[in-house]
A protein has these predicted regions:
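Conserved N-terminal Rossmann-fold NAD(P) cofactor-binding segment
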Residues: 29-81, 91-93, 97
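Acidic/polar active-site rim loop that often engages polyanionic ligands
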Residues: 26-28, 79, 142-152
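NAD(P)+-binding Rossmann beta1-loop-alpha1 motif at the extreme N-terminus of oxidoreductases
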Residues: 1-53, 105
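Amphipathic alpha-helical segments at domain termini/boundaries
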Residues: 25, 62-83, 164-173, 179-180
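Rossmann-like NAD(P)(H) cofactor-binding subdomain of soluble oxidoreductases
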Residues: 83, 88-148
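Internal alpha-helical scaffold of NAD(P)-dependent oxidoreductase catalytic cores
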Residues: 130-131, 148-181
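Structural signal for hydrophobic packing residues in well-ordered secondary-structure cores
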Residues: 47-55, 85, 106, 128, ...
Length: 181
């Protein structure tokens, strides 16, 4: 399996910030997307605020923000990303449009995972290019502290991509729970 080094996080609210913090704690290159540049400052503050807990949990000495970039362009965010964690609001219309865009700009072998807690993956990914690589990756909150993530495949999700997602989540100290669709 190709190692996943570059993670794109789409949406920088509570869940998105949690994924960003967890990935930074595991030395991943993280590209974050949100349409509002004003949110960058509050995100950086949240990363710094939570870092003492993360430092203890993962035995990290320092916070390296060199691995972190914030974009207001989804195309820039997705460039060369190996894993995409989408964290937008729970809304079918919004997520379906977003997944169509992500599918169009992500590299063909990039894993696409939605943090959705109650929407059906097949419906979310209805307009996504290469839906065999798409699934739900719903975390427990706060993501940077609680290590559980539910992985839910869509009808077109391949076992190969599910296994890659599982290994990635394990590489960032998550305990994947494989849910049948």
């Amino acid at each position: 399996m190709t190692k996943i080094n570059k993670v794109a996080v789409i949406g920088t609210g509570v869940i998105g910030a949690g994924w960003i913090i967890r990935c930074l704690a595991h030395n991943k290159i993280v590209h974050a997307y949100d349409k509002d540049i004003k949110l960058k400052k509050s995100l950086i503050n949240e990363i710094k605020r939570t870092w003492p807990s993360v430092k203890k949990l993962f035995n990290k000495k320092t916070l390296n923000l060199k691995n972190f970039k914030y974009f207001t362009s989804i195309q820039q965010t997705l460039k060369d990303a190996d894993f995409i964690q989408e964290c937008a609001s729970e809304n079918y219309s919004l997520k379906t449009k977003l997944m169509s865009t992500i599918g169009r700009y992500a590299k063909p072998n990039a894993i696409i995972s939605s943090s959705s807690s109650g929407l059906l993956p097949t419906k979310i990914y209805a307009k996504c290019k290469n839906p065999e690589r798409a699934m739900i990756g719903h975390p427990f909150n706060p993501v940077y502290l609680l290590p559980a993530v539910e992985i839910v495949p869509g009808k077109k999700t391949s076992k190969k991509f599910l296994e890659k997602a599982k290994k990635f989540y394990e590489s960032i100290s998550m305990n994947p729970i494989m849910v049948k669709h």
